[in-house]
């Protein structure tokens, strides 16, 4: 397993993530304010761009599904599906959306509805409800799947059709990827983005589990118990990944769908 680790990419990613976490922990108040300001700036100034890009991804995926590339077989002309449709759907929902959908599927529309900043002054109950659901559908509907689908298709095509390494840098060509440091930089950025994206979903899920167990008086709701839940979930995920798609992730996904 360790032979497949790329030393440069792993070490640079580890150093940057560790440095970021350390700086944040030693400056919690300043970091909290900075993150809030960045989020507000992105929401206020670039919200239109995010929605435009999401729609662009959706249109592009529809084109790929029905355009001239619709008959392209991932893995080569003789490739056969490795999993049934049922198993694929289970893995997509469990590994793709997971606790994020479980937590925000209900919470997000409610949060949008209660936020006065998102609604025109004097908006009716139905207008607020419709706008709240529209935003939730943008995040958890076809648009989200289109974005995930593009990345998944890129990995599948360049890895299994073009026999390139399973890395984000394999998607690109040109001056940026002609030298090793250009390729490493792209992969490090992708690794950091993935880690923090997973951390967000994991944190939300751990908080939800902690809150539920606290409500049922099974476990005291506290920071320590949240950390313990994160560790348990992380270990389960790690074991699942080490066991591979055919055993770990497949079985865990099937259990999630049943639950």
Please state what every model-predicted region is.
Residues 1-125:
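N-terminal alpha-helical transmembrane segments of multi-pass membrane transport
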Residues 1-4, 28-42, 61-80, 132-139, ...:
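Membrane-water interface regions at transmembrane-helix termini and the short interhelical loops
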Residues 3-4, 8-11, 15-25, 58-61, ...:
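Helix-loop-helix module between adjacent transmembrane segments
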Residues 12, 46, 53, 186-194, ...:
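Membrane-interface loop-to-helix entry segments
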Residues 34-44, 48, 121-148, 172, ...:
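Membrane-core helix-loop-helix motifs of multi-pass transport proteins
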Residues 78-81, 117-128, 165-183:
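Juxtamembrane inter-helical linkers in multi-pass membrane proteins
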Residues 106, 110-112, 117, 153, ...:
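Generic secondary-structure boundary signal with a strong preference for alpha-helix termini
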Residues 112-131, 209-227:
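Hydrophobic alpha-helical transmembrane segments and immediately flanking/interface helices
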């Amino acid at each position: 397993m360790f032979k497949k680790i790329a030393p440069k990419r792993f070490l640079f990613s580890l150093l940057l993530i560790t440095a970021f976490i350390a700086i944040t922990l030693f400056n919690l108040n300043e970091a909290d304010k900075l993150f809030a300001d960045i989020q507000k700036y992105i929401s206020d100034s670039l919200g239109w761009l995010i929605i435009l890009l999401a729609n662009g991804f959706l249109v592009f995926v529809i084109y790929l599904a029905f355009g001239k590339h619709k008959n392209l077989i991932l893995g080569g002309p003789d490739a056969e599906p490795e999993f049934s449709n049922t198993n694929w759907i289970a893995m997509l929902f469990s590994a793709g959306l997971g606790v994020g959908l479980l937590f925000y599927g209900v919470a997000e529309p409610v949060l949008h509805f209660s936020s006065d900043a998102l609604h025109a002054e004097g908006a009716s109950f139905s207008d607020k409800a419709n706008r709240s659901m529209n935003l939730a559908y943008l995040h958890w509907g076809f648009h989200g799947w289109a974005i995930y689908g593009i990345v998944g298709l890129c990995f599948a095509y360049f890895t299994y059709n073009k026999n390139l390494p399973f890395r984000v840098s394999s998607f690109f060509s040109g001056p940026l990827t002609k030298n090793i440091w250009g390729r490493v930089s792209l992969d490090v950025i992708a690794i950091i983005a993935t880690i923090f994206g997973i951390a967000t979903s994991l944190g939300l899920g751990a908080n939800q589990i902690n809150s539920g167990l606290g409500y049922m008086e099974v476990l005291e709701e506290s920071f320590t118990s949240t950390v313990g839940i994160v560790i348990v979930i992380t270990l389960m995920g790690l074991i699942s990944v080490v066991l591979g798609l055919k055993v770990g992730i497949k079985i865990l996904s099937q259990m999630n769908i049943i639950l």
